[in-house]
């Protein structure tokens, strides 16, 4: 029996980046042999075992045969005769189809190291087209490795286009779409995930609300990039620069969905997009099972980002109403997240990426002034029942007025 480190750990070792998970393949073993050596069986569909000491996953070498539609339609075959090369060829990309033995020797039958040197994401074999999830995985790897200069090989992109056109992507469950989208949000370039899916035609299938933004014009005076889809990619990139928060990055990507349903007769104006976008965000989040933490922030950013952009024009009472909607008195950190999204929106415009965004500081100053109002002082002054809340609102608005010099 021979044990090999495989997949992402080998790739990341060669790239010189941090390794978080290590997966192993075992050649020449059986389930009985693994159990006799103290491994614990955990795999349901195929034999995966946990190492008795490290608890890292060790899978028996296996082959796969397409037996039905979608990414679950596979039959697995494993026994002692399956070779390392046979196991590696079923993997998605050449850079993920390398192995290393316990002495550090590299096994690279499909040219993964060469593609790492060339910074190319290339499929291992034609079997790539059998698993629609691979389209999303390639887009995610493109986002993960974009900062190193990686791009998708043209022949791989063509296979992805063919898969998008075939209808096979419709077999992906909402949970798997969200799983890959969610993982892409933690990369250095989440926008690349969306742009690769757009380039191969998959975005229209899995995230049609975002795809609908491409080709929709905005006023050139405010948006030199004009195209709402391009703007969305730019905002996604800016949000990733400004924050590591995944809900912030998600909210930035969907904040303008309403522009995708503006009637053409109203273009390039989108006066109702902060309102129309709310329904689209709810529908999208329900469909791909987005967690409430992400959904709630996205809805608040969508509804209020235009108001925050014109913070200097708002009356103190209006600012208090907005802060109340955000529930900042109980969730103070939420305001910072919303302001970062708005700043990303402001910076996600061609040639205006470095323009200051004083609105964020203004809104934060207003919040701090309003938060300083002491409810106990209001009670001491003799206010009771609902009158306490009314007086609190008045004093908060007055505090904002003083702080902002209005």
Curated annotation (Swiss-Prot):
GO terms for biological process: RNA repair; tRNA 3'-terminal CCA addition. PROSITE patterns: HD. Residues 228-329 form the HD domain. CTP binds at residues 8, 11, 91, 137, 140. Its EC number is 2.7.7.72, 3.1.3.-, 3.1.4.-. Comprises two domains: an N-terminal domain containing the nucleotidyltransferase activity and a C-terminal HD domain associated with both phosphodiesterase and phosphatase activities. This is Multifunctional CCA protein. It comes from Vibrio campbellii (strain ATCC BAA-1116).
């Amino acid at each position: 029996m021979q044990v090999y480190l495989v997949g992402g750990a080998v790739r990341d070792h060669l790239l010189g980046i941090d390794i978080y998970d290590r997966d192993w393949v075992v050649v020449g073993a059986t389930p009985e042999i693994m159990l006799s050596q103290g491994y614990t069986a955990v795999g349901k569909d195929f034999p995966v075992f946990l190492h008795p000491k490290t608890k890292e996953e060790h899978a028996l070498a296996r082959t796969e045969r397409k037996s039905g539609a979608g990414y679950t339609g596979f039959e697995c075959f494993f026994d002692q005769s399956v070779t390392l090369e046979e196991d590696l060829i079923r993997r998605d990309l050449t850079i993920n189809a390398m192995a290393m033995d316990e002495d550090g020797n590299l096994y690279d039958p499909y040219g993964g190291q060469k593609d790492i040197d060339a910074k190319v994401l290339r499929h291992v074999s034609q079997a790539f087209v059998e698993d629609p999830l691979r389209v999303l995985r390639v887009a995610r790897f493109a986002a993960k490795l974009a900062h190193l200069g990686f791009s998708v090989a043209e022949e791989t992109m063509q296979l992805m286009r063919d898969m998008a056109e075939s209808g096979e992507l419709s077999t992906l469950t909402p949970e798997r779409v969200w799983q890959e989208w969610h993982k892409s949000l933690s990369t250095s370039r989440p926008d690349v995930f969306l742009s690769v899916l757009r380039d191969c035609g998959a975005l229209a299938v899995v995230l049609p609300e975002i795809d609908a933004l491409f080709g929709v014009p905005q006023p050139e005076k405010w948006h030199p990039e004009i195209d709402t889809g391009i703007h969305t990619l730019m905002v996604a990139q800016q949000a990733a620069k400004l924050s590591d928060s995944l809900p912030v990055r998600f909210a930035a990507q969907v904040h303008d969905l309403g522009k995708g349903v503006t009637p053409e007769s109203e273009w390039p104006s989108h006066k109702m997009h902060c309102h129309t976008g709310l329904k689209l965000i709810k529908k999208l989040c329900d469909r791909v099972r987005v967690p409430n933490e992400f959904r709630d922030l996205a809805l608040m950013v969508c509804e209020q980002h235009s108001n925050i952009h014109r913070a200097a024009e708002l009356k103190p009472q209006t600012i208090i109403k907005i802060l109340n909607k955000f529930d900042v008195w109980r969730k103070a950190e939420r305001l910072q997240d919303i302001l970062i999204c708005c700043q990303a929106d402001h910076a996600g415009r061609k040639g205006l990426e470095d323009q200051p965004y004083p609105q964020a500081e203004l809104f934060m100053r207003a919040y701090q002034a309003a938060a300083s109002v002491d409810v106990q002082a209001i009670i001491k002054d003799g206010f009771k029942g609902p009158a306490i809340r009314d007086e609190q609102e008045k004093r908060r608005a007055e505090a904002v007025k003083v702080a902002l010099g209005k």
